[in-house]
């Protein structure tokens, strides 16, 4: 049988499969998918986040094979992974550092969307699906942080689950349901482990929907103008796949540095102490990617008020397409918005710093000012800038 016959047979098999399950057509669509020709390296962040998600799922599944979700054995099983499982230390550090790298990519991805107006029509649903992914990521990361069953894991779970008790009438039953009893204990750990395993696969489904929404109207671009002809676009492959690999290289260099040289830099030393319900840590601190929201939570003395503000800080992102009244997408052509954007970024970083500090003065008072500006940016600054700002002239073509 010569090569031509073999090639025809293999093509026939591919066509037979593709007719019934169009996998190959779908992959071909990605190859020929037309993308704006002026995308910069900030558009790599979506692909980087996708790679980070795959790494988390692979390492998480392998770690789950060796983890014991029981309050008497969870801490020891993690230490056993570190010492007795082949390359267990690498798996654990890759998973722990990978969570931080995933959030870093997502935060930059969101910041890029805010600056370039990627939430504006016709991409509102694309933005909303992205925020839902972010919410589920936060829930997944929180439950994952509980699993090592160290001091910070236990007390972090106690503090955060207790927040639901602030809800009038139904708060206490919700907390008891979350705990599976009257305190954080074995049922809590078991259900957190089950949900932590499940949620990444829900994220995968949402990522697919995110991509479907993206391909419906195409990517936004740094100029924030619509594509008018095929001259404004280039195929995603090979042009942007090659560009993505450059971003992957930078990402993996930073990733490798933390894994091999500073694996615990982003963690907390108290989590290397087994959970003890009788001893409260001097300072309960969440992971760095929750610190801005933690600062918002602690900014007011009322528990219900803090919970309301913390969840409101994320809900306001859903309303963003309608709060920003400007018709111009890109911050490059909005001089006043550009200043407001960088002030907002500084405010978010400052909230992260304040979230890492003890609940004492002057941090509480400063936090209130920072939280006030956070909400003013969305509810006051954006609507007013959209009405009164004089944007720069938009270019005609990409």
UniProtKB/Swiss-Prot annotation:
SUPFAM superfamilies: a domain/subunit of cytochrome bc1 complex (Ubiquinol-cytochrome c reductase), Transmembrane di-heme cytochromes. It is a multi-pass membrane protein. Its cofactor is heme b. One of its GO terms (cellular component) is respiratory chain complex III. InterPro entries: Cyt_b/b6_C, Cyt_b/b6_C_sf, Cyt_b/b6_N, Cytb/b6-like_sf, Cytochrome_b, Cytochrome_b_C_euk/bac, Cytochrome_b_N_euk/bac, Di-haem_cyt_TM. Heme b b562 binds at residues 95, 196. Keywords: Cell membrane, Electron transport, Heme, Iron, Membrane, Metal-binding, Respiratory chain, Transmembrane, Transmembrane helix, Transport. It is found in: Cell membrane. Its main location: membrane. GO terms for biological process: respiratory electron transport chain. The keyword Heme applies. Heme b b566 binds at residues 109, 210. Binds 2 heme b groups non-covalently. The chain crosses the membrane at residues 45-65, 96-116, 129-149, 164-184, 192-212, 245-265, 277-297, 304-324, 339-359, 366-386. One of its GO terms (molecular function) is ubiquinol-cytochrome-c reductase activity. The main subunits of complex b-c1 are: cytochrome b, cytochrome c1 and the Rieske protein. Component of the ubiquinol-cytochrome c reductase complex (complex III or cytochrome b-c1 complex), which is a respiratory chain that generates an electrochemical potential coupled to ATP synthesis. Belongs to the cytochrome b family. Heme 1 (or BL or b562) is low-potential and absorbs at about 562 nm, and heme 2 (or BH or b566) is high-potential and absorbs at about 566 nm. This is Cytochrome b.
């Amino acid at each position: 049988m010569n090569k031509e016959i073999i090639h025809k047979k293999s093509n026939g098999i591919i066509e037979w499969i593709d007719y019934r399950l169009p996998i190959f057509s779908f992959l071909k669509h990605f190859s020929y998918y037309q993308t704006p020709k002026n995308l910069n390296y900030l558009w790599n962040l979506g692909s980087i986040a996708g790679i980070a998600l795959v790494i988390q799922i692979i390492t998480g599944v392998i770690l789950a094979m060796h983890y014991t979700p029981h309050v008497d054995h969870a801490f020891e099983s993690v230490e056993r992974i570190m010492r007795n499982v082949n390359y267990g230390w690498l798996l654990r550090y890759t998973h722990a550092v990978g969570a931080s790298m995933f959030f870093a990519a997502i935060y930059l991805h969101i910041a890029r969307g805010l600056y370039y107006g990627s939430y504006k029509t016709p991409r509102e649903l694309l933005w909303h699906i992205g925020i839902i992914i972010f919410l589920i990521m936060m829930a997944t990361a929180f439950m994952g942080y509980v699993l090592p069953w160290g001091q910070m894991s236990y007390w972090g779970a106690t503090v955060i689950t207790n927040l639901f008790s602030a809800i009038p009438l139904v708060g206490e039953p919700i907390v008891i349901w979350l705990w599976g009893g009257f305190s954080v204990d074995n049922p809590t750990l078991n259900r957190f482990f089950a949900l932590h395993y499940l949620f990444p696969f829900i994220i995968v489904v949402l990522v697919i929907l995110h991509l479907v929404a993206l391909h419906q109207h195409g990517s936004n671009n740094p100029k924030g103008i619509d594509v008018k002809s095929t001259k404004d676009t280039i195929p995603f492959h090979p042009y942007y796949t090659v560009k993505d690999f450059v971003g992957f290289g930078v990402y993996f260099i930073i990733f490798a540095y933390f894994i091999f040289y500073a694996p615990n830099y982003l963690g907390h030393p108290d989590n290397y102490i087994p959970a003890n319900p009788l001893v409260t840590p001097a300072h309960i601190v969440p992971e760095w990617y929750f610190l801005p929201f933690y600062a918002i939570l602690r900014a007011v003395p009322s528990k219900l008020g803090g919970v309301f503000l913390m969840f409101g800080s994320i809900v306001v992102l859903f309303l963003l397409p309608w709060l920003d009244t400007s018709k111009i997408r890109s911050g490059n052509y909005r001089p006043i918005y550009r200043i407001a954007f960088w002030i907002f970024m500084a405010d978010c970083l400052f909230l992260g710093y304040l979230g890492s500090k003890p609940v004492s003065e002057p941090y509480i008072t400063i936090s209130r000012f920072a939280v006030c500006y956070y909400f003013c940016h969305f509810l006051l600054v954006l609507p007013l800038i959209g009405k009164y700002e004089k944007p720069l002239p938009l270019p005609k073509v990409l």
